[in-house]
């Protein structure tokens, strides 16, 4: 058993990877409006700043800035998962006995990857990783063509050029 201990830093900037249980499903993009609604509800109920996000068919990459006196990212992730699952059609929500016992939905992996951003270089690497991910997985050939990403917001803010190509060799811990 792993001795991994999660970091809890008040006001921390965290990178998350949140993954569907069945990686062959594309619920996150098939039901993008439901995801957006669940995300909005989560932000309203448990405020945080979205520094960057990329929604892929079977997983999400998210850079979340917590409020100054708050370290509870887990409640935000759990709430997002719950709200999205509730909005899915019933046939998508599969439950087995063990998951019912722990009040878990069958669509999500139980755990998620979390990483506290340490410095500006770490932040830049994670931003690049998030935005290049749809290209890495073969969903698009260029970053700007992926519609489910905050990349477009960052282009408008002149943080990234629209023709930014990414770094195909960039690897980060927790790469999926």
Swiss-Prot record:
InterPro entries: RAYT_transposase, Transposase_17, Transposase_17_sf. Mg(2+) binds at residues 59, 61. Disulfide bonds: none annotated. The active site is at 148 (nucleophile). GO terms for biological process: DNA recombination; DNA transposition. Its cofactor is Mg(2+). The keyword Ribosomal protein does not apply. GO terms for molecular function: endonuclease activity; metal ion binding; sequence-specific DNA binding; transposase activity. Keywords: DNA recombination, DNA-binding, Endonuclease, Hydrolase, Magnesium, Metal-binding, Nuclease, Transposable element, Transposition. It holds the Pfam family Y1_Tnp. Homodimer. Belongs to the transposase 17 family. RAYT subfamily. Transposase responsible for transposition an insertion sequence (IS) element. Transposition occurs in 2 main steps, excision from the donor DNA 'top strand' into a single strand circle and its subsequent reinsertion into the DNA target. This increases the copy number of the IS. This is Putative REP-associated tyrosine transposase. It comes from Haemophilus influenzae (strain ATCC 51907 / DSM 11121 / KW20 / Rd). The lineage of its organism: Bacteria, Pseudomonadati, Pseudomonadota, Gammaproteobacteria, Pasteurellales.
């Amino acid at each position: 058993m792993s001795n991994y201990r999660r970091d809890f830093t008040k006001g921390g900037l965290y990178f998350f990877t949140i993954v569907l249980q069945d990686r062959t499903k594309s619920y996150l993009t098939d039901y993008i409006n439901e995801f957006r609604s669940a995300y909005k509800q989560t932000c309203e109920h448990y405020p945080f700043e979205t520094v960057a996000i990329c929604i892929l068919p079977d997983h999400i990459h998210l850079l979340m800035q917590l409020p100054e006196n708050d370290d509870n990212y887990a409640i935000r992730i759990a709430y997002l998962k719950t709200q999205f699952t509730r909005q899915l059609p019933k046939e998508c929500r599969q439950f087995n006995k063990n998951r019912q016992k722990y009040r878990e939905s069958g669509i999500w992996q139980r755990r998620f990857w979390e990483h506290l951003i340490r410095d500006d270089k770490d932040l830049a690497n994670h931003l690049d990783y998030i935005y290049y991910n749809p290209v890495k997985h073969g969903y698009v050939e260029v970053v700007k063509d992926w519609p489910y990403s905050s990349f477009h917001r960052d282009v408008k803010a002149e943080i990234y050029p629209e023709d930014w190509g990414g770094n195909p060799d960039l690897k980060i811990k927790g790469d999926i």
